[in-house]
Regions:
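Conserved ATP-binding/catalytic motifs of P-loop helicase motor domains
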Residues: 1-504
Length: 504
C-alpha cells in the first residue's frame, strides 16, 4: 500500500481520507507520473477513481471538468488536468468532442462499433420470411421477423415483456426450419444460463442442439479452438455486458463475401436498457450506447405479459419519469429488524416470496451485515423457519451456479432449489444467507414482495438502481429510504454514456 505521507499531497488528502480515492488509484497515478507533479498526479488519481466507478469519459465545458468528486470543484479538476504532460496525455487518453476517454477503452469501443456496422449491412445465412407464430403477440411477431431476418438486432424491453420467451420461439422456429443450424446462447451469469437451460428443456431442446454457456466459458473455449463458429449467437442479459466482452463475442462471428454481398452469422442481444449497467472500469452503459449508435437495430418490446400489481407498475413508471415515489422514512436499525423479522415469519416457505434489497455491500445497511442481523433476530424465536440462501460457487454436477437461490430447512439440514433435487447441507457449503441481497445480484430474479433499503451513502447511484430493485417485485414493493438520498438519486441523470452528453 502506498504511504500517505510520501504519495498524497494536500490536494488529495481529504479525498483519500474519505476513501473516494483509494490505494489502487494512487498506484495508477504513480505508475504514470511522479507524485512530485502534484496537480497532474492528483488528476490521474481522481480520474482513476471515476473510471473505477464506471464513468466512461470526462466532459470539458467552459474550463470545467465533469464529473468531479466531493471536495474538488470542476474548475479545480480542470486545472489539475491542464497540468498533465503531453506525453502522459497522449499515452493514456483520447480527447474527442471535448470528452476525455481512456485510450484502451475508447479503442475497443470503436473497433466494436466498426464491426457491428459491417454486421448491420450483411445478409443473414438463415432467414424466416413468412413465419407468423400464434404463440406471440403482434408486437412480438414484428420483433421476431426483424430479428431472424437481419444479422444484428437489439431486443430491448422491461421485465415481463417476453424477451426470453421470444428468444426461445426464435430458436424453436429456426431449428424446425434448419435442423443443422448452429446456435449458441451466452449470458454474463451462470444463474441466467441455468434459467435459459431450464426453459429450453421444457420445449425438449437439448444442448446437443443449442450451446448454452456463460460468456467467459464460451470465449475461453473459443480461444482454445474447442468450439466452432455459430450461425446464431444470442446474448442474454445484455445490459450487464461490457464493451470489451461484446467486442470479444463479435470476434467469434464469421462472414464471407459472395459476389459483392456479405453473408454473416446472426447476433441478437437481449436486455433492458433501464437496468443497472455492468460493473467495470469505464464501463458506462454499453446497451444504451448501442441503441443510440444503431437505432435502426433496436427492437423494442413495450407490453408486459407478466402479472404485476398496479403498485409495482406505477413505481417503475414513476422512477423512469423521475417522479417522486411513496416511501417510508428509513427506521432505526432495531425497528427495521423487527419489521423485517415479522415479514419473514408471515411469508410462506419459498425462496421467491420475500427479499430485502440494498445497494450497499458493507456498513450497517449493507447486505452482509443485514443478513447476519436478520438471521440472529429470527433464530431467537423461530429457529425452525426455512432460511433463504444464495449459492456462492458454481457446482455444475448439481446444476447450481453462483447467484442461484434456495432455502435451507433447519430441521432436516437439506438445501432446496427450484430446479434441483435437495442436497445435504453437509455435502455443500458454498452458500450464504439471503434474507438481504445486493440490487446488482438480484438482476434476473423475481420475488412476490420486495423491501428496498436506501440509506445515506447511496447518492453515487442513479435511478437504474431503483428501477432494477423495484422491478424485482411482482406483488408488493416497499421502499425504506433516507429522504434526501432518495431525492438525489431520482433527480440525478444516468451515468454518462458514450452516445449522449450528460453532466452531473
Amino acid at each position: 500500500m502506498l504511504s500517505l505521507s510520501s504519495d498524497v499531497s494536500h490536494l488529495l488528502y481529504d479525498v483519500v481520507q474519505q476513501q473516494i480515492v483509494r490505494p489502487l488509484d494512487l498506484a495508477f497515478a504513480k505508475r504514470h507520473i511522479s507524485s512530485e507533479s502534484k496537480k497532474a498526479f492528483a488528476f490521474l488519481a481522481i480520474s482513476s477513481a471515476l473510471w473505477r466507478c464506471g464513468y466512461p469519459f470526462l466532459s470539458i465545458e467552459n474550463e470545467r471538468l465533469f464529473p468531479s468528486v466531493s471536495g474538488i470543484s470542476e474548475n479545480l479538476f480542470y486545472e489539475y488536468f491542464q497540468a498533465l504532460p503531453n506525453y502522459v496525455l497522449s499515452s493514456l487518453f483520447v480527447i474527442e468532442n471535448n470528452k476525455i476517454y481512456l485510450k484502451s477503452l475508447y479503442t475497443v469501443r470503436e473497433k466494436l462499433f466498426k464491426k457491428l456496422s459491417l454486421l448491420s449491412q450483411a445478409s443473414n445465412r438463415y432467414s424466416l420470411t413468412t413465419t407468423t407464430l400464434s404463440s406471440l403477440s403482434q408486437e412480438q411477431n414484428e420483433v421476431f421477423h426483424k430479428a431472424v431476418n437481419s444479422c444484428f438486432s437489439l431486443i430491448c424491453g422491461g421485465p415481463g415483456t417476453g424477451k426470453t420467451f421470444l428468444a426461445v420461439q426464435i430458436i424453436i422456429a429456426l431449428i424446425k426450419r434448419y435442423p443443422k443450424i448452429r446456435i449458441a446462447i451466452v449470458s454474463p451469469t451462470g444463474k441466467a444460463t441455468s434459467h435459459i437451460r431450464h426453459i429450453l428443456s421444457k420445449h425438449h431442446i437439448s444442448e446437443a442442439s443449442v450451446t448454452i454457456q456463460t460468456i467467459h466459458r464460451f470465449l475461453q473455449e473459443h480461444a482454445y479452438h474447442q468450439c466452432t463458429s455459430f450461425d446464431l449467437l444470442l446474448v442474454d442479459e445484455g445490459s450487464m455486458v461490457t464493451f470489451s466482452l461484446l467486442h470479444s463475442l463479435v470476434n467469434t462471428l464469421s462472414g464471407e463475401n459472395k459476389r459483392g454481398e456479405i453473408i454473416a452469422d446472426n447476433l441478437i442481444i437481449l436486455g433492458d436498457e433501464n437496468q443497472l449497467p455492468p460493473i467495470g472500469v469505464g464501463a458506462g452503459n454499453p446497451l444504451q450506447d448501442l441503441i443510440a449508435r444503431f437505432p435502426e437495430r433496436a427492437l423494442h418490446l413495450h407490453v408486459s405479459h407478466r402479472a404485476k400489481t398496479n403498485r409495482v407498475q406505477n413505481f417503475s413508471k414513476a422512477i423512469l419519469e423521475r417522479q417522486a415515489i411513496p416511501f417510508t422514512p428509513l427506521p432505526p436499525m432495531l425497528t427495521a429488524l423487527s419489521r423485517i423479522k415479522e415479514a419473514f415469519i408471515n411469508t410462506p416457505s419459498s425462496q421467491t416470496q420475500l427479499c430485502v434489497l440494498t445497494p450497499m455491500r458493507y456498513g450497517p445497511w449493507g447486505y452482509l451485515r443485514l443478513n447476519e442481523l436478520i438471521f440472529h433476530e429470527i433464530q431467537k424465536t423461530h429457529p425452525e423457519l426455512p432460511i433463504p440462501i444464495m449459492i456462492t460457487e458454481r457446482y455444475e454436477a448439481w446444476g447450481l451456479f453462483n447467484g442461484d437461490t434456495g432455502y435451507l430447512c433447519p430441521k432436516t439440514q437439506k438445501l432446496f432449489f427450484s430446479h434441483s433435487r435437495f442436497i445435504d447441507a453437509k455435502e455443500f457449503s458454498y452458500y450464504t444467507y439471503n434474507y438481504a441481497m445486493s440490487v446488482h445480484k438480484s438482476q434476473g430474479s423475481e420475488y412476490e414482495d420486495v423491501i428496498v433499503i436506501i440509506p445515506k451513502g447511496c447518492e453515487t447511484f442513479d435511478i437504474s438502481i431503483l428501477y432494477t430493485a423495484i422491478t424485482r417485485a411482482k406483488n408488493n414493493i416497499d421502499v425504506w429510504a433516507d429522504r434526501e438520498t432518495l431525492y438525489k438519486i431520482i433527480k440525478k441523470p444516468h451515468k454518462y454514456t458514450y452516445g449522449v452528453d450528460r453532466l452531473l
